[in-house]
Every structure is written in C-alpha cells, then in structure tokens.
C-alpha cells in the first residue's frame, strides 16, 4: 500500500466516523492555488455551490456524481475539470478525491451560473 493510499484510507475512516460524513485535508495553499484531499462517506452530499475560476477532481477511490446543469459520474482513477456552473458533489460510494482549485484569475470571478 502506498503512502497516498494509506493517507486516503485514514481520511476516509475519519469521514465515516464524522457526523456529517466528510473529512478534508488542505495540502497546498499557495497564492490562488489550493489542493485539498476530500473524503465522503457513501450518501454524503456537498450542497450546491459556486465553482471557482478553475477546478478539477482526481478520484483516488470510490465514485461521485457532480451535478449542475449536467451530471457527471466520476470513478476511481479519473480526472475531470469541473464545469463553470454551480454544482453539488454526491458520494455514490465511500470516496476520496483530490480537489484542485485556482481561486482567482485576473479578470475572472467565481462562476455562479449566471450569464
């Protein structure tokens, strides 16, 4: 088992024990760049929220659904960019993913789904 697998397992154990079914660890906070590992217990949802100017999810394990104007199911080992719309994230299975965001881009704001 790799160190990444072990850390992901520990974070998922923490999420499964948490009342809200989730746990997160910020790995990188450098200017506008953020990288956070997030663990969600099956059935847990991150409620609809605005998308930052740029974001991606890499799923280490499990399966999640990202729902906004469109729905996308992401499986283990997949990397996807997030839409520039409001969206929610639901854990279809116990899941751990790396969320990478760029919180500011000159001339662009967070995407609220408004035209």
Report residues per predicted region:
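Short beta-strand His + acidic residue motifs that chelate non-heme Fe in jelly-roll/DSBH
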Residues: 46-48, 66-67, 86-92
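A cytosolic small-molecule/anion-sensing beta-strand core signal
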Residues: 60-61, 75-76, 93
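Glycine- and acidic-residue-biased ligand/ion/polar-headgroup-sensing regions
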Residues: 42, 52-69
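Conserved short histidine dyad/triad with adjacent acidic residue
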Residues: 20-21, 31-51, 84
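A short, N-terminal "cap"/entry segment at the start of jelly-roll beta-barrel domains
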Residues: 1-32, 67, 113-115
